[in-house]
Swiss-Prot record:
Residues 118-293 form the Helicase ATP-binding domain. It is found in: Nucleus. One of its GO terms (cellular component) is nucleus. DNA helicase that may play a role in the repair of DNA that is damaged by ultraviolet light or other mutagens. Exhibits a magnesium-dependent ATP-dependent DNA-helicase activity that unwinds single- and double-stranded DNA in a 3'-5' direction. ATP binds at L131, S132, T133, G134, G135, G136, K137, S138. PROSITE patterns: HELICASE_ATP_BIND_1, HELICASE_CTER. Belongs to the helicase family. RecQ subfamily. Keywords: ATP-binding, DNA-binding, Helicase, Hydrolase, Isomerase, Metal-binding, Nucleotide-binding, Nucleus, Zinc. GO terms for biological process: DNA replication; double-strand break repair via homologous recombination. Signal peptide: none annotated. A motif (DEVH box) lies at residues 237-240. Its EC number is 5.6.2.4. This is Putative ATP-dependent DNA helicase Q1.
Amino acid sequence: MATFIFSRGNIFFYVNKITIPDLMSDVLLSKLSTELADLDGEIGQIDQQISQLRRKKSELTQKRQAIERKIELKTNEDSDVVTDRWDRDGFPWSDEATKILKEQFHLEKFRPLQRAAINAVMSKEDAVVILSTGGGKSLCYQLPALLANGLALVVSPLISLVEDQILQLRSLGIDSSSLNANTSKEEAKRVEDAITNKDSKFRLLYVTPEKLAKSKKMMNKLEKSLSVGFLKLIAIDEVHCCSQWGHDFRTDYSFLNVLKRQFKGVPILGLTATATSNVLDDVKDMLGIQAALTFRAGFNRSNLKYKVVQKPGSEDECTEEIAKTIKRDFAGQTGIIYCLSRNDCEKVAKALKSHGIKAKHYHAYMEPVDRSGAHQGWISGKIQVIVATVAFGMGIDKPNVRFVIHHSLPKSIENYYQESGRAGRDGQPATCILYYRLADIFKQSSMVQQERTGIQNLYNMVRYAADSSTCRRVKLAEHFEEAWEPSWCQKQCDTCENGNGFVGTSSKESTDVSEAAKTTVRIIEEHLNSAKDGSGRITGNKLVELLTKKLKGSRNREFCEKLIVNLLLEGYLQEDFHYTVYSVISYVVIGSKWRVYNGKDAIKMRHVEESKSRKRKASSSVEEEDVMVLD
């Protein structure tokens, strides 16, 4: 641009004149800006692709590591070979062990893996025992205490379970006790003196992890016990609680990593009903027992029949259906119903009573005398059904439980396996029924979202419940990394009974749900944009309601629920949690996978055939918000 000056009389004029080079400069600048914007767009797309590739690489790396771990375990030593080496007679103490088993515990023979674990710890080997619920884990440390004529320290998270075991041991003439906040000064003094006396007849001391972590006096007494040669074994019950990758991590278990260093030469025995390879490796690392022997029982309980039932839309319908099932299939037989909350327990128990079923609720907020009364009434048979939270079950010794019903979705496959495993301990046929619907996912996710692997564990449970085409035992075997063929199930699950139990997806029709998925995302976007401040978030239940209306005539509510579950599990949608003063609310938002979705590739979902039992009127109203109230 150039400036010209000319005058007319005494007046001077300044004129700006645009030159050709100036015009060229503006055009060039505009062109460069356009190119820059295009490059930014391409870079953004590449960033998204890189992000997607990184996630894919992470998934493949995890799969590779899992396969490598399996190869390593198989190469080093087959678990059956390890078990065979230890699960036999011929050890110096074998005859005495059998004698104690029969004369002290009044048992005729060892259960699977009990003898192997006993022989290992008597040989001063560290070991981890994975035995299903009711498999007899407690004998693995109780008998060695008597066999070694010394002290077994038992770390257990539940005082109630500890007290039950102590009563049982004392009835067998075995001196044992616990040290906790309820222990009298006289009893505490007696125990402390006993565990530091090598000639004492005291055999088992039960403590919680908190007790060890907070009591220097306790640790000092145990060191003295070791110095006089009296401490023979440290057993850690529910050892999966050590792992942050587990389904029930407890921070107080972190202190236990000092035990191996502090009590050198004392074998550590970890016990649990469930543990994946990841959890098992983490537990061993945390406790410093990387070379520990592993004794793992197979996951399969052949006498248990697994079923998943579409949960009715209203609570009244649900309890009515449960009552009908109990009356029709389990008349006069003992059972457990697990609920998510204490409120649910009380409501379900009350509803069952109205149907003439002898039921009683059980949860941690009851007075101890009421809780004990419910427990004893159920054990004695006066109460047919106990309706409980997860507070009920650990250490329960009732072999003739014929059914376990889950009123709501458990938080992990491990929890489900352990809780359902309380059925049929006598080896006779028993049934495990899981009632499942979309709303339960959001109630449970609001509770577990702060746990390190809470959502991951929950979604694994959802995959089990939502898959109506794969053998239930195949799903369990995959999770616990065991080999399983659907034919071995013998129609002992609902999918195999219906002829659907297969492995893979190729043999079952899949439906292209791309358009329905796009409609789902549009609803979320419209809801979000409807609020000027961007606060128009949508809950899962509301999304189902709107999607069902949108697809009215072509798809029913059941399809919409299954679609949303599928999109959540595949990462096209995700949950977003928000806190209020009294609750945690789950909202459904667009997931990372949708952000890189090109809109062309087909999104497929396995075909759903609506069964007669599912052709019920589902409530279209949002009966329960996706909210978990904070107590």
